[in-house]
Swiss-Prot record:
Natural source organism: Allorhizobium ampelinum (strain ATCC BAA-846 / DSM 112012 / S4)
SUPFAM superfamilies from the UniProt entry: Class II aaRS and biotin synthetases (SSF55681), tRNA-binding arm (SSF46589)
Known partners and oligomeric status: Tetramer of two alpha and two beta subunits.
One GO molecular-function entry: phenylalanine-tRNA ligase activity
Residues reported to bind Mg(2+): E260
Gene giving rise to this polypeptide: pheS
Cofactor annotation: Mg(2+)
GO CC aspect terms: cytoplasm
Cofactor mode of binding and number, as noted: Binds 2 magnesium ions per tetramer.
This enzyme's EC code(s): 6.1.1.20
Name of the protein in question: Phenylalanine--tRNA ligase alpha subunit
Length: 361
């Protein structure tokens, strides 16, 4: 039995000397691996006589069990030691304030928020969202919308023209979102109820104008659409968007090439508090949008018979109504990517606006 005792002493010494998990694994393989010293002894059990199994066999199994227990205990000891060493090296001040999550630190840009608010309001009224290209043809941007030749909007001082293509046609950066109206009429049969948010481009830049700005407009086409429907939709929108119980609006006659009759819409407000305008109260008036009944020529350009269908449309500047609602003094701040400005005027990303909540909180 002296050989078993010697092996046991040697293996226990190796186990005790192991300083990490790699070392203890090497000892395990040397003892219990396929060709390990204990495994080789276990292979001899089959050739032993019954008497030998009772004595030497029992001693070999006892050696195996003890070595296995010692290996397991050493592994646990080394694992605990590694954890303790890491904890000792990693200092953590539990009195420090908890970091906010990325969702709390980030902010939604006011324009993105305004688009979400407006589309949520009109979606709850049964409207769908339509979009179109920023680079438009002269036809969709002007001709199909009843802009006559020589109209000021066709001049270089107001419109960004691209270089002529191989066919000599010059495309433009769209000056309004109205081309989507004609594209929708061509692609979809009435009834049509769409709201169209998007970027537009004009050569203008000051505290209240930008060469690139945002618009949203709506379009309704069916056989019975009228100004009464238009007024109701705009009143409901303004009450919800400006979060007031009632609004007083007035429709002033105006002119737009693509609508007839055309109106500019004013809303009653209180402008005595500086940049923040209070809607639904006061004695002041402020223009917020333009609208009208879709011109018969625009219906024809969209492939519709004006004797059978009629409709109305409205449009407004997203940047301007954002400035009005939230008291922002300078349009140029919208595009400066100032983190401090975003932290002040931005919105929490998990606050999704709907008709029933989350519009500005």
């Amino acid at each position: 039995m002296s050989d078993l005792e010697s092996l046991k002493t040697s293996l226990l010494a190796d186990i005790a000397a192991a300083s990490d998990e790699v070392g203890i694994e090497a000892v395990r393989l040397a003892a219990m691996g396929k060709k390990g010293s204990v495994s080789e002894l276990l292979k001899t059990l089959g050739s032993m006589t019954p008497e030998e199994r009772q004595t030497r066999g029992a001693a070999i199994n006892a050696l195996k069990n003890e070595i296995t227990e010692q290996l397991t205990a050493k592994k646990t000891e080394l694992k605990d030691a590694a954890i303790n060493a890491r904890l000792k090296a990693e200092t953590l001040d539990v009195s420090l304030p908890v970091r906010s999550s990325p969702a709390e630190r980030g902010r939604i840009h006011p324009i993105s928020q305004i688009v979400d608010e407006i589309t949520a309001i009109f979606a709850d009224m049964g409207f769908s969202i339509a979009e179109g290209p920023d680079i438009e043809t002269d036809y969709y941007n002007f001709t199909a919308l009843n802009f006559p030749e020589g109209h000021p909007a066709r001049e270089m001082h107001d419109t960004f023209f691209l270089q002529p293509d191989a066919n000599g046609e010059r495309k433009v950066l769209r000056t309004h979102t109205s081309p989507v109206q004609v594209r929708t009429m061509e692609a979809q049969k009435p009834p049509i109820r769409i709201v169209i948010p998007g970027k537009t481009y004009r050569q203008d830049s000051d505290a209240t104008h930008s060469p690139m700005f945002h618009q949203v407009e709506g379009l309704v086409i069916d056989k019975t659409a009228n100004v009464g429907h238009l007024r109701w939709i705009l009143e409901e929108f303004c009450k919800t968007f400006f979060e007031v119980d009632s609004v007083t609006m007035r429709f002033r006659p105006s002119f737009f090439p693509f609508t007839e009759p055309s109106f500019e819409v004013d809303i009653q407000c209180d402008r005595s508090s500086g940049p923040i305008v209070k809607f639904g109260e006061g004695k002041d008036w402020m223009e917020i949008l333009g609208c009208g009944m879709v011109h018969p020529n625009v219906l024809r350009a969209g492939g519709l018979d004006p004797d059978e269908y009629q409709g109305f449309a409205w449009g407004m500047g997203l940047d301007r109504i954002a400035m009005l609602k939230y008291g922002m003094p300078d349009l140029r701040d919208f595009f400066n990517a100032d983190v401090r400005w975003m932290s002040h005027y931005g919105f929490r990303p998990l606050d999704v606006p709907t008709l029933f909540g989350g519009l500005s909180v």
